[in-house]
Structure formats: C-alpha cells, structure tokens
C-alpha cells in the first residue's frame, strides 16, 4: 500500500489460517477489525480492534482462531535484522 525508505505498510487479511514465517525486519500490526489469538514467540494473547502488536525481527509469530472479518495493517520498518541488531553494534 505504501513504501518509503525502510517503511513498508500493507493490509493483511488472512483467511482460514495464517501462513506467516519470521520476517527480517521489525513489524507492527494495528488491528482494524476482528478478534482472535496472537502468538508472539512464547506468548499468546487475545486481540481485538485498535490493538497494536509489535514483533521483533526474526521472531516466530502468527494469528490463530481469528474471526472471518479479521483485517490488520502491518508496518515493516527499520534495518534488516531489526533495530535490536543495530543497537548491538553501537
């Protein structure tokens, strides 16, 4: 939907199951509609409209048991390896 420098904004609306694999950059989800369970590493929690979810680069994550109307913005940003990789080299 939108790209500028290291910023990439998309709409994500999986149906049935969420086939995601870890990404190379940090990401933020902003839930627009729907509910479900978000798995972020070893943590599982319920989400709903308006929730903001952060996933560091390289972390296993997925949406489970989500409603048919689930839609979220996903924002990828920063360097490959995530901001934490940059912080380690400073």
Task: For every predicted segment, state its role.
Residues 23-38:
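Short, conserved beta-strand element in jelly-roll/cupin
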Residues 1, 17-23, 40, 45, ...:
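Short histidine-centered beta-strand/loop micro-motifs
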Residues 1-20, 25-26, 77:
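A short glycine-rich, His/Asp/Glu-containing loop-to-beta-strand
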Residues 42-57:
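Short acidic-glycine-tyrosine-enriched beta hairpin
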Residues 17-18, 53, 57-62:
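Histidine-centered metal-chelating micro-motifs
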């Amino acid at each position: 939907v939108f790209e500028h420098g290291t910023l990439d904004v998309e709409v994500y609306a999986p149906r049935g199951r969420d086939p995601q694999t870890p990404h190379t950059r940090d990401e933020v989800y902003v839930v627009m509609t729907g509910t479900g369970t978000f798995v972020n590493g070893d943590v599982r929690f319920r989400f709903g409209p308006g929730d903001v979810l952060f996933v560091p680069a390289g972390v296993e994550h997925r949406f489970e048991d989500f409603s048919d109307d689930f839609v979220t913005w996903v924002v990828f940003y920063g360097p490959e390896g995530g901001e934490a990789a940059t912080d380690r080299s400073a």
